Amino acid sequence: MATDSGVADEAVTLRLPASLPVGDLPRVALASLLRIHRIDPTDVGDLAVSVQDMAVEMNESGSDVVVDYRVYGSEVAVELRGDGRTLRISAPRS
């Protein structure tokens, strides 16, 4: 949930070491966060697939991957860091 300042009240961070395969963890973590905030997964479209694909790509390059999940009043945002890159993927909440 967002405060009036637009800053997320809560952030969840998932750290995935390069030495282990990513598996479904990024997608499952997002699904859990959506459930906690009572957000219908269909409201954020293909966000879960995009997060999963990018995390796997970064991990397969031999990099640790850090995934930050944030829920705002108007969007769900995910930031991925790894492989020397930082990517932000978001979807509006309907």
Task: Give the label of every model feature segment.
Residues 22-24, 28, 47, 77, ...:
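Residues in flexible loops and secondary-structure boundaries
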Residues 41-66:
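Conserved ATP-binding N-box helix of the HATPase_c
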